[in-house]
Amino acid sequence: QLRLETLRIADNPETIFIFDRYIHSAIVYREAEGLNGNWVREINKNVPKSDLSFYIDITPEESIKRNTDTKFNIHYSISILKIVRDRYLFYTGKGELVFIDGMKDIDCIQRQIAEEIKRHL
């Protein structure tokens, strides 16, 4: 609640918010669990909408390989990660997310994200 209030206070045309995860994350993971994504959208209808959202695509196998952060200890099976990836690709196809190839080198990824941000400013 406090974060939402902070967003409302700071909501002006010159403010840029950068989130590491947002509504689409909740949607695709709930869909991977068999829930209806529209339900997730409905319960999040009062959350401020993003002007630009990215999906950084990597394979499920690469996701498991890169998941070395024991802070959160979040582990999903390959089968769930495949569904998650398919759902993200569905939303990129609908134009709700900007597709970024996460298998490319970090400099290339950074350039592509910066170009997309500049295009939307």
Identify the meaning behind each predicted range.
Residues R21, A26-D86:
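A glycine- and Lys/Arg-enriched "phosphate-lid" helix/loop adjacent to the NTP-binding pocket
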Residues E61-L121:
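NTP-dependent small-molecule kinase module
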Residues Q1-E14:
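Phosphate-binding/switch loop-helix module in NTP-utilizing enzymes
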Residues T15-F19:
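Generic beta-sheet signal
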Residues D11-P13, E31, N67, T92:
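Hydrophobic residues in alpha-helical segments
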